[in-house]
Amino acid sequence: EYDLTEKMTLFGSFGAGKTQVERLFGYPEIQNSAGDTSDTVSYAKFQTKRWTADAGVRGEFETGFVGHKATFQVSRYSDEFSRGLLNGGATLNSNIYSPVANPMDAVSVPASRPKLSETDLTGVAIADTLSMWDDFLQVTVGARHQRIETDNFNATTGAITSGYDDSVVTPMVGVVVKPNNSLSVYANYLEGLSRGSIAPDTATNAGEAMAPYVAKQIETGVKLDYGNFGATAAIFQITKPSGQLVNNVYNSDAEQRNRGIELGVFGEVMPNVRLLGGVMFLDAELTKTNSATTQGNQAVGAPEMSINLTAEWDTPFAQGLTLSGTVNHVSEQYVNTTNTVDIPDWTTLDLGLRYKTIFAETPVTFRATIQNVTDEDYWAGVNEFSMVSVGAPRTALLSVTADF
């Protein structure tokens, strides 16, 4: 950042990275209610190269009784995805309740990583927050021009097989009313162009980038902030595409509408006792699908309720010692769009302590945490490709930090 004046600042950033992954893996598919699975082992080599940059200017000024905080920004993001994949020949059968130790299937290492897709995102945005009557009313208006260019490539010939070049101007507007210093009431609406999903490895079109889409979000809520304690409440609606596998081909031709309520607390509820967390109630409905068996169903991997609440206590018997506990709860989640299979709800408890002291004139903090104290066995979640992940077992974490 560079301050041109007291009220005008230039800013910019740049970043780049390359990720390479080589792995032998499989995706066991559950065949029936008894938990029987079937799988074919694959060997994959992935590579993702990416870079991003942005620059802009921020400024503050007044027009009459109206204060302005304006921003102009340009941005660019580019990535390239490459993957080599070879499948094994043997089918491995097992059971999630009684695992079978199958002999290792010999799978060759892919000789190359052909490029499968590349994406470029460019954007130009402008926004202004107008403040009136000692910040009693704040109105933010803005617009962003976005362009997404995506090409998919044939893994053998390198030829472009499909592509997208979409651009759109998306709006953003928000209003905040502050009757007093502790209470804020707000509402906002925004749209954004996003890149499409990448087809999963289990699909016949694995690695293919889906078309860009415009997501729309509307939200309204209330925030109470008394300095040492506060609470929030919000309701929201988000519409976006939803992907699905049809005849083993992945497409994002469905639409998902998320409606929800979020309640949160933060701060000191009594001397030396703090709370942080909240609860979310979610109705994630498939509003547009290509099948009557999925129309109106709940989206994959979208729990109707999730809770995360952490409490901390600064102990009176040991100066610098803080004890903490976290409760996590997630309700059942559907595994498929027909809503015939789900994973059950789960609850875990984490316990920890933090001890601050001075060692050799250096502030030092010791931390110890045990996650999933009761060692619950559970399915943690489901991704958009109907892949179920196993919850982490009881885990102990230790760390030491020093402020020099």
Where are these regions (language model features)?
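Transmembrane beta-strands of outer-membrane beta-barrel pores
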Residues: 16-22, 59, 74-80, 143-149, ...
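Membrane-embedded beta-barrel scaffold of Gram-negative outer-membrane proteins
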Residues: 1-15, 19-25, 185-186, 211-268, ...
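Repeated loop/turn-to-beta-strand initiation elements of outer-membrane beta-barrel proteins
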Residues: 7-10, 65, 135-139, 181-185, ...
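Gram-negative outer-membrane beta-barrel transporters
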Residues: 134, 237-239, 252-337, 374, ...
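Face-selective signature of the C-terminal outer-membrane beta-barrel domain
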Residues: 1-19, 41-154, 178
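Surface-exposed loop/turn segments flanking beta-strands in extracellular/periplasmic regions
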Residues: 31-37, 84-114, 160-163, 206-209, ...
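C-terminal beta-signal and adjacent terminal beta-strands/loops
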Residues: 272, 317, 328-335, 355-404
